[in-house]
Amino acid sequence: MKRREFITSSVAGTVGAGLAGGATPAGAGEAGEAVQAATTRKILIAGGGFNTPFIRYMAQLTGKARPKLLFLPTASADSPQGIIAWYRNCAPLNVEASHQISFIASTQQAKGWDEVLLSVDGIVCSGGNTLNQQVIWKAHGIDAILRQAWDRGIVLGGASAGSLCWFEEGTTDSRPKELSTVQCLGFLKGSHCPHYDAEAGRRPLYHKLVGSGQMKPGYACDNDAGIYFEDNTVKRVVATRADADVFHVSLVDGKVVEKKLPAERID
């Protein structure tokens, strides 16, 4: 089978081995506990690099022994390389991995967006062009369905465009010539700056925008570092390397304050 045929035809793929240590977080056992966990709205982001450790952590957050995790590569224009990388990153984990492309035709797509997106335990959004991602989601009503997913306790997440999309606004490379700003879904209040350590222009622009009041205070994440939110509360800061950091950036007495948030290592 050709690679492109594999990508377009493989709406659901199954991979498996095991979550780290076989651990399942509290809330997965008793029926009452599972209901309680489902009412908590969860988002897991990374500044860049939503790879196997982050996917493993998301799987644990679902509270399921073998969760269904779906990749939504809209921002990357349904890149075949990104989809293949998704399955490769899921391969060591005991998850049921799938993906849903956005560039579809009614003759090829039998299920509605809600039937697909609301039937899984976690949704990971790709990096890419955030501006295009937002426009496509709104045109299809995917933005509203993602809100339903969040409200139902389906774990949402991603890196780069896949982290920025959940906030009210943030910095983006989605337009020609220079970094700019983009308005997003607003599930998480405030702003976001991904790739904080990886792209030279990100930090000074973010400081300028927050300092001038053009952008709300928010969270900056290095590549390989991220945040787990329950509702709009930071519950845990994580990283996959020692020098990857997360910061809260705000305006205090007319000055930009960058506060480093201690991160826990995940593997």
Model segments located where?
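N-terminal export signals
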Residues: E5-G27
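C-terminal and late-domain segments of enzyme folds
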Residues: G32-R66, P80-P92, G122, G170-T172, ...
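General beta-strand structural signal in soluble alpha/beta enzymes
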Residues: I45, H99-Q100, V124-C125, L156-A159, ...
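Short, flexible loop segments at the rims of nucleotide/cofactor-binding pockets, characterized by
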Residues: G47-G49, Q100-I104, N132-I136, Y196-D197
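Short internal beta-strands
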Residues: L70-T74
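Portal/gating segments that form or line small-molecule/metal binding sites
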Residues: S76-N132
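Class I SAM-dependent methyltransferase SAM-binding "motif I" and its flanking Rossmann-like core
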Residues: C125-R203
